[in-house]
């Protein structure tokens, strides 16, 4: 029997004029919400990965800019003391926040569109323009929730039909659930839907070093809803696929290029290579805002690299646990590129499942985007 949707987990707490974001670095040991008051607050929250997950970053950014403008409006000599000053503040805020993290396309696409919409708003007062921005941001929020629901529904239905088993076992990486989006999730949203319908045997979650989003966040979400979950270390994926019945690999995405090449959490390509070897269908689940027809392929994607201490220091104690020496170099890319040829199952969006062609180009992202 299908279960009702459960939306008890949330990383974004918003009401007009106020925004609080869950500091996901502290989960699962602490549940701490940070109040976001300024543009600097949201830039730092994104940069420091207090908020993470491409959809959640984009939604939080839009809401935060509206909240920051409202707070600026309250200042006697603030930047929002005129219509022109407010518009300038909003546009410059979008530009600033876009620089926080470069790889996820949702952030830049969302804020570029928000800038266009703000430029088109006709307002007689600064307060009217701030209110219009809040309405635009709230629309972005609501649309992401609707995207989550569409991805869940289409993905679960497609997998059920493909696998033709009463229950499905799925492997995933990172965290792509309610904590990474506005409500239910993308790849983990599909897992949720399978669970709600009584069709999930097991979800296997990679720990996802170095931030352990799988161990800390995905497992946390599964435990909260009693979703059957098995945690594995990242290096166990090939052994898992070779020894246990894995019906599909489902991952999220931070950017899907015009040819279908996909930027996602580091380690995703490892899963795709292993899945191809063992004949396991590999799916990418993401909202259509993650589709990027302007970027030709994975070679054109800027891959974010983070601080070396994420690899050399214990996250719990902040003490160095790796030897130091002049011959040592540290490489810490946050994302990798999965070639479109390895996305063998298809791309799941809120519009349906885009299945690959038999030969290159395997996906026509431009056609999908232009059809919207």
Swiss-Prot record:
Keywords: Amino-acid biosynthesis, Cytoplasm, Isomerase, Methionine biosynthesis, Nucleus
Catalytic site: 254 (proton donor)
Protein name: Methylthioribose-1-phosphate isomerase 2
Sites annotated Transition state stabilizer: 174
InterPro entries: IF-2B-related, IF-M1Pi, IF_2B-like_C, Initiation_fac_2B_a/b/d, M1Pi_N, NagB/RpiA_transferase-like
Enzyme Commission designation: 5.3.1.23
UniProt cross-references to HAMAP family, sorted A to Z: Salvage_MtnA (MF_01678)
One GO cellular component term noted in the UniProt record for this chain: nucleus
Subcellular location: Cytoplasm; Nucleus
GO BP term, example: L-methionine salvage from methylthioadenosine
PANTHER family: METHYLTHIORIBOSE-1-PHOSPHATE ISOMERASE
Family to which the UniProt record says this protein belongs: Belongs to the eIF-2B alpha/beta/delta subunits family. MtnA subfamily.
Organism: Trypanosoma cruzi (strain CL Brener)
SUPFAM superfamilies, per the entry: NagB/RpiA/CoA transferase-like (SSF100950)
